Amino acid sequence: MHLKMLKSKIHRATVTGANLDYEGSITIDGELLEAAGILVFEQVQVANLNNGVRFETYVIPGARGSGVINLNGAAARLAVPGDQVIIMAYSWCSESEVREWAPVVVLVDARNRVAKVLAAEGLPPLNMTGPEK
């Protein structure tokens, strides 16, 4: 059995732009992509904290250190500059891999700069057996 697990997320980033006339995607600062381990053209889910909308798109890289989080194409209708979003990437894992699985969480500051990275070694592994007794 394989399970779809959170691979990484960029938490509470601020949308910096929306470009309806672009072909589609989300542009993300290259430093944020690197910190989160998200690849160019990788599918991501975006959750808008301001309006509750969730949608999927793919990633294109923005200038490193720019703080850019730009929604392009149809996604530009789902958020406005200033909205806060969570950007999540997923990975398929075997049941044995899940036992030691922990995602990378990138926390950002108000300018979408990396504030802190909680890597797999910084988070507890998923307890598949339930709460400790």
Swiss-Prot record:
Its EC number is 4.1.1.11. The active site is at residues 25, 58. InterPro entries: Asp_de-COase-like_dom_sf, Asp_decarbox. It is found in: Cytoplasm. The keyword Lyase applies. One of its GO terms (molecular function) is aspartate 1-decarboxylase activity. Its cofactor is pyruvate. The modification Pyruvic acid (Ser) is found at residue 25. Its main location: cytoplasm. Substrate binds at residues 57, 73-75. Pfam families: Asp_decarbox. One of its GO terms (cellular component) is cytosol. Disulfide bonds: none annotated. Is synthesized initially as an inactive proenzyme, which is activated by self-cleavage at a specific serine bond to produce a beta-subunit with a hydroxyl group at its C-terminus and an alpha-subunit with a pyruvoyl group at its N-terminus. It catalyses: L-aspartate + H(+) = beta-alanine + CO2. One of its GO terms (biological process) is alanine biosynthetic process. Keywords: Autocatalytic cleavage, Cytoplasm, Decarboxylase, Lyase, Pantothenate biosynthesis, Pyruvate, Schiff base, Zymogen. Pathway: Cofactor biosynthesis; (R)-pantothenate biosynthesis; beta-alanine from L-aspartate: step 1/1. Binds 1 pyruvoyl group covalently per subunit. Belongs to the PanD family. Catalyzes the pyruvoyl-dependent decarboxylation of aspartate to produce beta-alanine. Heterooctamer of four alpha and four beta subunits. This is Aspartate 1-decarboxylase. It comes from Desulforudis audaxviator (strain MP104C). The gene is panD.
